Every structure is written in C-alpha cells, then in structure tokens.
Amino acid sequence: MSLSIGIVGLPNVGKSTLFTALTKKTGLAANYPFATIDPNVGIVDVPDSRLQKLADIVNPGRIVPATVEFVDIAGLVKGANEGEGLGNQFLANIRETDAICEVVRYFKDPNVMREVGRTGEFVDPAGDADTIMTELILADMGTLEKQLPKLEKEAKRDKELIPKFEVAKRLLAWLNEGKRAASMEMTDEERAAAKGLFLLTMKPILYVANMDEDMLNDDLAPIDGVKPLPICAKIEAELSELDSEDAADYLESLGLEQPGLDVLAQAAYKLLGLQSFFTAGEMEVKAWTVRQGATAPQAAGVIHTDFERGFIKAEVIGYDDYIELGGEQGAKAAGKLRIEGKDYVMADGDVVHFRFNV
C-alpha cells in the first residue's frame, strides 16, 4: 500500500538530519536554507514487537515488517504561497503526500542559522508552526478561489455536484478565518466531497519537536491542539550509525527506552489510518498494511490482486489467541480459528490465511 508522509518545516529545523536517520539514506543536511531542493523519498520499517513473538512460534526463514514512506520536502518560508523561496515546488510536493509530519525547532544553536533577522538562539515553536500553517491555509484559499467559478457552473448542470460546490464555499469562508480545513465540522457526505478539492490543510498532521538532548523529558505545550513528539535529531543520527547492541547501550546511557524514530514511524503509520494483519508460515512472518476499516477481500488484495478477485473466505485467528495458544494448531483445537466472509472487517493484528479461486 503506497501511502506517504511528507516531512516539512522551516529551513534548518533538522528535517534532513531526521530523514537521514530514519531512512539511513544520505541526504543533504546543510546550514543554509533550501539544502533540500528535490524531495528525497525513503521507505521506513514500522517497528512491531508482535512480529518477533509470532516468529518465536513459527520459526520462519525471515521476518518482514510493515513499512511507511517518508518524503523530505524543501524548507518552507513565509510567502511560499506566492512562490517565495521554493514555495511553488514545496506546495506541489506536499500535495502529493497523504499526511504531514512537521518538524519544529526547539533546540538552540548559534551556529545553525534561522531565517533573516533571527539568531540560532531564538526559539518559537508555536510561531514557526503558525507560519507554515498560514502558508498552507493561504495556498488552499488560492486553490478554492480558482475552483469555485468552475464548480458553480458544473453544479448548475449537474445537481450531484451541488454538495461539492457548497462545501467548497463553506471551506473558503472557514479558511479565511485562519482555520485549517480539517477542523471544520462536516457531514460524511461533505467530507467525501471535500476530499475531491485536494486541500493541503485537510491532510492529517503530526508535529515533531527537534530538541536538545537535555530537553527530551520536558513537558511540551500542544501545537494546534496536538502534543508534539519529542525527538533529538542529533541523537537519532548517531543511533542510526550504531549496530543494535551498541545502540541499545547508548539508549540505556541516555535513559531512553527506544529510539525516537521508532515512535515516529509508529505514529506516522497511525496518522495515515493504517493497521497491520499478519501471515505466518515457515518461509516468513510478514506484516501487511491495510487501511483501518478494510474488508477481508481488500486485505487479500494487498497480497495479490488475484486473492481479492477470487476471494472465497478468510481463516482468521486473533493475535492474542495465536500467541496464547501457541500457534495455528492450538488455536484450531481451542475453537479460536474463525471462518470469515467478504463482509468481514479486518482487526489490527489478525493472523490470516486466505482461500481463493481464480
């Protein structure tokens, strides 16, 4: 399932350092605005302790985790909606992603420049986040102002387009009050219509606080009602260079339970509205990705389109039952293996075997 989350932020907040640590790819991190020009794309494993527990029972040849795609997008500056800096490219790149991960600067460093007129000692996370949100809101207003005349004409010819036109008008007024589109109260019908408007502020958003090491345990104030995820990009970059044993020792010395990047990957997965189901056999134990609310045939189609086309049934064991009863045979003996049809909605952690015929 190809869904992506765009890493955005003002210049020099640590986006590329974070991306490099996440993906273990060499990105360009430099002390000047727009070090990132063309977006870098990386596939990141989503840590899931359930995989190893399944593997301990099945003893497979390999373990395959779920993944999420991160895109490192050029730093944004005030005026991006009018093309300032790399504004047009920034907005085009973020429009192609499914969610936003905004990195906000909490660290102080006189050697790492900020925008013109501010030193590296200046920290204003809420103001920085507001700058980016304002640019996204202004960009969305421009999008709607261009779309509305056309939508009005189309709605007069086709009554089915009236809901889209009406919600577009409401959204423009809402955005004009400085509020993001996603925060407007909408019916299910209106929300479905709004998706077709391709607004940036309809995308789900996650805030990451790039902090100094000694700030990681600080209680952070919410940004736009969302509690930021505390991460020290420098620490994460160092951890990414270590083997697993040395990394564990380093984490322990810092008093941290797990890398911040593991938490970020898991948070991004949830932000995208994703969940995992598992297949478990001698060859591999694998986490497969589906949207929350996916049916059994849709999940089967993630493995292969033939599985969805020829879906017959799904043999399902809940994850907890699978572990508690020692695997498939124990679950069968205890009556915990269920036969589910095409209307079954997948639960997170289901261990599944699909039956199909093509």
Q: Where are the language model's segments positioned?
A:
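C-terminal-of-GTPase-core extension/linker across diverse P-loop GTPases
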Residues: 2-8, 13, 19, 150-347, ...
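Phosphate/Mg2+-binding loops and adjacent switch elements
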Residues: 81-206, 216
